[in-house]
Structures are given as C-alpha cells and as structure tokens.
C-alpha cells in the first residue's frame, strides 16, 4: 500500500532513482572540457590532488564528480573507450553501495572503474570480486592502464598463488579476485600463528561482479577449511550393495520436489534384514540410517552426466548453474562417498571443520558492499533482506531491439527437440547465429547428436569443453555459428555480432611493438596513434590514408593486416545484423526466472537486433515436478496431433507460478542457512576477536589476569557457597589450588570473623594465584614468558575452537529430530549452541590458567627466542559445502588439501583447491 502511494506521489522507484542520479551526471559532464584540456602529466597528478582534498576534510562524495570525469578521460586516452552517461549512473549507484542492474553489453567492467578508483583514494583498499580466475585476471589487465595512468596500484589473486604473492596483491590499492579466494584467505588469516602471516588488510569496499551468481546462487555453499576425520569407508560399500535390492513403491518413495527419498516401514524391515541388524532406529544405528538415506539419494536422485560425471576414477560434480565441471568440489554429508561407492571408484575419507563461513556473513564484513549484474531486479527482496542492498536499474545506452517470442510447449521431449532443430535449420539457411541454452550436459549432448544427424555443424560448450569456453562464446556471434551451451556457461564474455573483433587486441599491442622496435619519432608515433583512433571509430578510409604515412615497414605491414581484419569483421558484423542478430533458443525453463533472463540477455546487446524463444515439453523437470497435469489434460482434450505446439497464456502463467514457487523455496533455504550460520557467526566473531588481539598485542597479561579473576570466582562460588564458612567444601578448594602447584592451605576458620567471608576468600585465592604467576614470569624472564604465554593461549584457543566446530556440526546434523517432538529446530540449535559455546569459553579460561601456572621451563627453553615469526604454513583443506534446510553442510573427504560445496537437495557439494605454495 505504502509503495503504491509513493508511486502515485513521486513516481516509480526507477523514476525516483533516475531523478537522484541525473543531476550528479550533469555535474560530472561539466568538468569534461577542463579535464580534456589537461596534458597527461597534469591528468595523472589528479590522484595526488584528490588525496590532499580528502586529507583536508572533504569526503569521497565531494570529489566524486571530478574524479569520475578524470577516469572517463583517462579511459579514453588509454583504452580508447569513453564512459556513457548511463555508465556514470551505474558508477554512482555502486559508490553508494547498491546493486547496479545493467543489461548485457552495457559495459559493466568499464563502469566499475569509476567507483573502484574513487574508493581507492581512501588508502583502505578496494576488492573487486569475480566468479572465476580467468575473469579476475582479464578484468584487472584490461583496466590496469587506466589505474596505472592515475598512479593507483592493481593486484590480482589467482588460485595457485603462494603466500607472498597474495600479500603483495592485497597490499595494492585495488585487488581483483574470486569470491572463493577472498573468503578462504579470510579464514586462513584467522588460522595463522603470527600477524605477519596474514595476507588481507581491512575489509573496506567490495564490488561483486555477477552479484546474483555469487550472493544468491552460491549462498547455499559455505566456505569450509577442514582436516581429515578418522572414519572407515567400508560402511559405504556395505550399504551400497543393498540399494539395488530395494523396490521403489514398496521399500521407498521418491519426492522429486524435495529431492529426497523416503524409506517406508516395509523398507526399514527389508534394510534391517539385508544389513543383519535388529533395529535400524536403535541409538547405535543412527549413523547407519544416515548412510542408507544418502545411498538412496545417490542411486535415485543424482544421475551420472546430469548431476555429476566420472572421469579418471573420480566423481566430479557438474555445477547446477553453469554446467561446468567443478573439479575438486565434493558433495557433503557422506553423499559424495555414496556416489563413489555407486560408481565403483575409490572412496575418500570424511573430514571435520577447522574454519567456516557463509558468503552471506563474509560479505557482510565489508564496510561497504556493491554489486553489478544484468539480472538482479527479480531478487531485489532477497538482496535487501539479507545484504541490505538496494537494486538500482540503470537504463540502457541504446534501446533494446531484441524480440522475445512466446514459449512453445509440446507434449513430449522428442517433439520439442524436433521443433528446436527445425528452428535452427531455418536460421542456418540465412546464416543467422544461434545460441541454444540447455540445463545439463546430458541434454546438450542429446541435442548435439540430433543436430549432427541432420548435418548441422555446431559447437558445444559444456564442462567438457571448459578450456575453450571464452573462445567458443566470443565467436558465437559469427555468421551461421550454432552454439549449444549448458545454462550460463561463458557468462562474463560478451557475444559480439560478427564474432570476436580480434583486430582490437592487435591494435592494443601496437604500442608495445613500437617500443620493441625503438620507434621514438614523435611525428610517426602520432600517425600510428591517429590510425588507432580511426580504427576504433571504424573510419576505415581515413585509417587507410594514415598507413601510407607510416615509415617503419614492420609497423606498416602490421597496420595493413589489422585494417584488413577490421574490414572483414565489419562485413561479418553487418551481415549478422541484416540476418536478424543473435537468436536465442531456450531448450527448457530453469527453476529461476533470473537464469532464463540471463540466457535471453546474451542477445540484443547495445541496441543490436536479436530474438529469443523457449521450447518446453510436459516432460521437462519444471513442468513434470511442479504440476503440468492440467496442461496435459487440455492437450488430450483438444486431441492435439503429434508435433503440434501449444501457445497459451495459461501455459505461461503456470510456468511463472512454478518458477515463483521454486524461487520462494530456494530463498527460504538460503534464509534458513543464514539463520543457522548467524549463531556460529556471533561465536566466530568473539573467537576471532580474541585471536586477533592475541596476534596484534602479543602481551596478553591483562586478559590472563581477567581469566584468573573469573576462574577463581567460579571456584570460590563452587566450593565456598554463601557466607557460612563451616559449610564450605574447603578441602576441594585446597585440592584445586594444589593441582595448580600452590601448596598454601586455606582454613575456613580464618574467615569466620570476616563481614563478607566469601569475598575475603576470593581475595586470598586470587592473590595466591597471581603471586605464582608473577614468580613464573620473573624466574623465566618477561620476554620469553610473553612468547610462551602467547603460544600456549593460541594453541589452546585453536584446539578448543576446532573441537567446538566439530560438536556444532554434529548438533546441526541431529537437530532435525527435535522437530518430531514439536520443538523448533532453529530455537533448539540456538539454545544448545549457546550452552556449548558458554562451556567452550569456560574451558578455555580454565585451561589457559591451569597450563600457565603449571608450566615448567628448562634452561634450553630460556635460551630460545620464540618471538620471531616462523615460516608460513597452510592448515587444512578448503571446501565449499551446500546445505539443507537445517544448515547441514560439510564433510569434505580427502586427506590432501582441497575445497568443497552442496546442492541442498540432500547432500552438499564441496569444492577443493590446492594449498598455497610455500
């Protein structure tokens, strides 16, 4: 209601956003003439000037217009690219800490240079987050000339970098990297033994590219660093043998919507007989029930060449959202081991958590967060509720010309694919490029075989062609190119009509060639620069005229070649535009409307023509699982002949309703995961706070003295309750003191005359404890003691935290059972988790106090100076683990270093990565 009133009075949100942005863009444009007149040296010195203004009290908002105008001019001089006004809007929105929704081809990477540069001026660092290493490196190198011209340093994090290389990258003003690398480096930084071994600085400002992919699609995959658990793998083989003997409908039912398998009462008895156990649900068999459940899912819910593939003796997960092979990623909770048993490959061991965090809680650490994507508006509610991010829709620079045609629905999958082939044949006849989106490797290969049988040449882009991904996508706009891609594989690489304009890459290399040939003549360099400008603006005749003035023969030949390539590309580009642009075929609807919109958005970039159509069948997963019975009955009633499609608003509405239901369900899962992780997050913040204080200060004597007071107080309350000294358990208190190495004997009679006996005994015991502590310090020496104290504290803290994480994992796995007792699992998890954490803190204090007071140091220990940082060592293995409604996640399963993740369809998937090189 409030939104309706707001719209009536002040216009739609989109209109209100534009009203805020337009005046700032006008101010930016007012600087253009002045800045354009600056020579390179003056323009480059703008950074120094801006930093001085910030130091004098101005804010980033104050200098935004001039800073943005500066970046625009530098980008034009270094890259030959000038920011459009709509890109300025996108940049302002990002600086404000919003999500800028910009359609495919609108130049998000160039747009990001504006807020990246502005926020780098604070000196606190900017993190630019991408979905993979290739894009991180590509974008950093692409935009590097802009930043380096302005004397701003750029670093890139790559998966195989060692510790020192990472440190250098993070100390740069701007750091590009993937969400996984940023997250894992954060966890590793909270596991180091010396502050010098940390790689990250503070978390100041992050811009997340493809923000919907990272903050929505991957939000169910916590980052986990784990170590191996001691557990046999035989049980997986034992359970796997009995699954083929169970009968669907009698022993179990399959719930495709929930991606679950439910064991019937008859099935329970059958399993008991096969496994030779008396009672499957006896306490000692709870783990066995879990393994049976996971084995059933492995056989009945997860399918080879759809959910995973088997390569080189390994089960490798196929990413649900991109169709890529996720090498090293593992399903969690024993599901991956069950799949390994099913496929007859070696079974890896399970593991336990050493450190973990969800993407939701990692990215909420940043002081300011922003994101870019072509499709965010459908998830605006989730971005606001979870991340407090507003979505601002940025207008396109040119009007979108793409025609989105109605869906065509067929009764069977065979009829649907026949129709897809006919559509492709029709486009092939006029050499119009086609991109076909499929939801799995299996479907892409079925369609590929069908096209080959009709003699249609094409490229297939799925996990098996991962290495050629960018090349295939870049050339998907060539005349007559037919490309089949799983989901959104290749996202981040624009499909340019006419194919990739490679001549632009060669053009960029001209400067380097001139340098290598020693060309320094100013007049000749200006001619080459003019040639470059003409080519960028596609003024080919003028460019040809410039070539004749080039004196160096090597450069002249290179210019002739580049011009020839540019002309050929222009012919292809114009031909494809005349043929109707890129045609998109969706071979199935995805669960999320956003993923469908991403596929459509590959066509019609920057005002180009294009078209799209989805082909569906009643056998598609979305239609089959979420209710296509009514549509099927109508098709039967109408006696529709084979091959006849159905186009009706009722069909479109049914699909939209199904997608909204699934989106709502997935949002609930992500929200639920966050509610569970918030419990751990509060605990994590407390432990990491103590840890960082320990590393940064080194001297923990004040904290230790606080621990003394709390531990002594607890012991006094335990053994000396109330002020009646005769009722005290004074012998127990003395035994505790003796266990610490304090021989002083306390007598209850000494306190009877005190007005507050309990307070007095606390003071006496506290004094005894601190005297022993002071004696230890003085006898060993302050410097050596501080080092010992720090190491003892750190060692105990890390061990207790690791044990606590293990216990919390088990609590999470078993908490669902309280639902049968009509209790709320989340509330029970919070209550029990708080009690366990409270116990952890008490144990930590007791153990630190006890260890420090009992410690004995030899002469050789005194001679060792342990204050200098040791060599950096990486601990544990990295994982990504998706979770179920109760947040159950991890259990990666290799003893060697790795990374993991899940689909909350029951198991979790885990993604592995190698250790940092030493």
UniProtKB/Swiss-Prot annotation:
Region annotation Disordered: where it falls in the sequence: 863-918
A biological-process GO annotation: protein transport by the Sec complex
Alphabetically ordered keywords of this record: ATP-binding, Cell inner membrane, Cell membrane, Cytoplasm, Membrane, Nucleotide-binding, Protein transport, Translocase, Translocation, Transport
EC numbers, comma separated: 7.4.2.8
Residues binding ATP, per UniProt: 87, 105-109, 494
Subunit text: Monomer and homodimer. Part of the essential Sec protein translocation apparatus which comprises SecA, SecYEG and auxiliary proteins SecDF. Other proteins may also be involved.
Molecular function as annotated in GO: ATP binding; protein-exporting ATPase activity
Name of the molecule in the record: Protein translocase subunit SecA
Pfam family, one: SecA_SW
Gene3D superfamilies named among the record's database cross-references: Helical scaffold and wing domains of SecA, P-loop containing nucleotide triphosphate hydrolases, SecA, preprotein cross-linking domain
Compartment(s): Cell inner membrane; Cytoplasm
PANTHER family: CHLOROPLAST PROTEIN-TRANSPORTING ATPASE, SECA INNER MEMBRANE COMPONENT OF SEC PROTEIN SECRETION SYSTEM
Catalyzed chemical reaction(s): ATP + H2O + cellular proteinSide 1 = ADP + phosphate + cellular proteinSide 2
Superkingdom of this protein's organism: Bacteria
Compositional bias annotation for Basic and acidic residues: 863-883
Function: Part of the Sec protein translocase complex. Interacts with the SecYEG preprotein conducting channel. Has a central role in coupling the hydrolysis of ATP to the transfer of proteins into and across the cell membrane, serving as an ATP-driven molecular motor driving the stepwise translocation of polypeptide chains across the membrane.
Coiled-coil stretches noted in the UniProt entry, renumbered to this chain: none
